[in-house]
């Protein structure tokens, strides 16, 4: 049997598929051996007959090699190329018509698309199971970056959205946090087979980014993330990832999370903690008057003046803010006609269908969940952006994936698509379920324990030093410097993490 499996696996070029193919054939041969032994054969004869029934290993291996190999989603790539070309032409036209300041983002659209394509290819070639293996670490990094943005990010209109990089370029943290959604899918998969304890941990991983993003405040992004992760959690419960009562769990989670925003608003309203600007916005939304109504009226007038084909007489570029970003559809309808916008929306609809079709046809449950997460983010953003352009949805911070100006929006869109392409690439390689935890090599146990002890000592000393410096700073400046607080918290968490690893190691090696 070993010689047969060795010859068969030599024909399969994809090394990632070999362990799963070997396990599948080995189990099949073992079952056949058991059946032959029950028929009266001895072990050696039963194994020989079972291997003979499997056929020629070379021919079988070659046929398996044609199936178990990386795949390319040519249809998805074709749609992405089409949308990218359309975006380049649109923003090249915008940048050529008006000044650099007025066309902020359009003049750098090609540069951002190139970076986005590079990110997409990196994530496409990178196995999505690698992201899943380090999903909790990636999630913590995103949460930490969001916290840093809240404490020391660039402030714009009373909100802290951006981390300013050297050279004056900024990263929109509220947009970057959309990467958390597919990562959350991998975190959900790590609790596969758990009960209510795992479900509560999954909810905690959902709440953490929502609180930080809402505090920015980026209400629209928080709502997009909330709905996306709730749908993913619902899918996980429905597919029996958690050993819980499905109907009660799903109804309880949705009821709780839908009631939370209402409760939060009532608390802030009754405690008079809402700002005058927020009160004015709410009054405008519910009463149909004020600044919001005039803006919506302007959008309606633009659409009423549009032609089916060709340019209208509306001065969209001069009157509409963010016409090349949030309201790109309104601009396109005024310049190229309503038919052009309808065709573009149809292309985006085909893209969304292709993404969900790719995700739902995944045999591997991890790839299915991560792909669905990306598709949900695309769907919600496109849907809200269309409604906002039509004046149906209140004015908010949105973007049209792949087409709105803004480096962060473009790069995040291509990055999410890279994850979808990666799940398709390995769809015929991985089985239905995977083990994505860290592998522990027992031969290196002593060295790992020594390193853990040394790191614990280093982090302990570092924590003490930082706390002493912070106390000294507090005495000198009469306040605690926020960066020292952050460093102290991080060092303490790392210290606790190392101590936990040592305890786990001692428990498993008694």
Description of each model-found segment:
Residues 105-134, 171, 177-193, 231-241, ...:
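Transmembrane alpha-helical segments and their membrane-water interfaces
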Residues 111-119, 334-355:
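Hydrophobic alpha-helical transmembrane segments
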Residues 194, 392, 398-471, 489-510:
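A juxtamembrane structural motif centered on a specific transmembrane helix
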Residues 201-208, 220-268:
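Hydrophobic alpha-helical segments of polytopic membrane proteins
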Residues 246-343:
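Hydrophobic, glycine- and aromatic-enriched re-entrant/interface helices and adjoining loop segments
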Residues 359-397, 403:
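Loop-to-helix entry and N-terminal half of a specific, functionally important transmembrane alpha helix
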């Amino acid at each position: 049997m070993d010689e047969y499996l060795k010859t068969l696996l030599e024909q399969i070029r994809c090394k990632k598929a070999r362990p799963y193919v070997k396990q599948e054939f080995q189990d099949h041969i073992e079952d056949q051996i058991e059946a032959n032994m029950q028929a009266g054969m001895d072990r050696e004869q039963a194994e020989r007959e079972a291997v003979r029934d499997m056929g020629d290993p070379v021919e079988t291996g070659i046929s398996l090699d044609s199936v178990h190999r990386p795949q390319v989603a040519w249809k998805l790539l074709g749609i992405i190329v089409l949308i990218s070309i359309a975006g380049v032409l649109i923003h090249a036209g915008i940048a050529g018509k008006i000044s650099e300041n007025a066309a902020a983002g359009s003049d750098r659209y090609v540069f951002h698309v190139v970076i986005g394509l590079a990110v997409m290819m990196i994530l496409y070639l990178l196995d999505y199971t690698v992201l899943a293996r380090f999903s909790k670490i990636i999630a913590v990094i995103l949460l930490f970056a969001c916290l840093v943005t809240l404490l020391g990010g660039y402030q714009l209109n009373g909100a802290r959205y951006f981390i300013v990089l050297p050279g004056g370029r900024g990263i929109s943290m509220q947009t970057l946090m959309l990467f958390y959604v597919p990562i959350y899918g991998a975190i959900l998969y790590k609790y596969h087979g758990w009960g209510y304890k795992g479900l509560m941990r999954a909810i905690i991983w959902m709440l953490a980014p929502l609180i930080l993003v809402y505090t920015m405040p980026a209400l629209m992004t928080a709502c997009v993330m909330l709905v996306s992760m709730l749908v993913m959690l619902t899918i996980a419960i429905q597919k029996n990832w958690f050993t819980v009562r499905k109907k009660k769990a799903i109804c309880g989670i949705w009821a709780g999370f839908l009631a939370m925003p209402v409760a939060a608003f009532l608390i802030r309203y009754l405690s008079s903690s809402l700002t005058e600007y927020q009160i004015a916005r709410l009054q405008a939304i519910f009463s149909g008057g004020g600044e919001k109504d005039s803006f919506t009226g302007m959008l309606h007038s633009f659409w009423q003046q549009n032609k089916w084909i060709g340019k209208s007489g509306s001065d969209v570029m001069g009157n509409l803010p963010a016409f090349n970003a949030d309201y790109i559809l309104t601009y396109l309808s005024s310049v190229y006609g309503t038919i052009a916008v309808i065709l573009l929306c149809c292309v985006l609809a085909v893209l969304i269908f292709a993404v969900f079709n790719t995700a739902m046809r995944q045999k591997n449950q991890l790839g299915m969940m991560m792909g669905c997460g990306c598709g949900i983010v695309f769907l919600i953003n496109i849907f809200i952006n269309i409604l906002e352009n039509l004046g149906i949805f209140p004015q908010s911070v949105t973007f049209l994936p792949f087409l709105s100006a803004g480096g962060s929006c473009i790069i995040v869109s291509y990055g999410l698509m890279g994850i979808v392409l990666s799940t398709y690439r390995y769809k015929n390689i991985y089985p239905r379920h995977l083990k994505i935890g860290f592998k522990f090599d027992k031969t290196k146990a002593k060295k790992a324990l020594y390193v853990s002890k040394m790191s614990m000592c280093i982090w302990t000393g570092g924590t003490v030093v930082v706390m002493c410096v912070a106390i000294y700073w507090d005495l000198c400046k009469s306040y605690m410097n926020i960066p020292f607080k952050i460093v102290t918290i991080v060092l303490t968490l790392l210290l606790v993490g190392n101590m936990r690893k040592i305890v786990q190691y001692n428990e498993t090696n008694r």
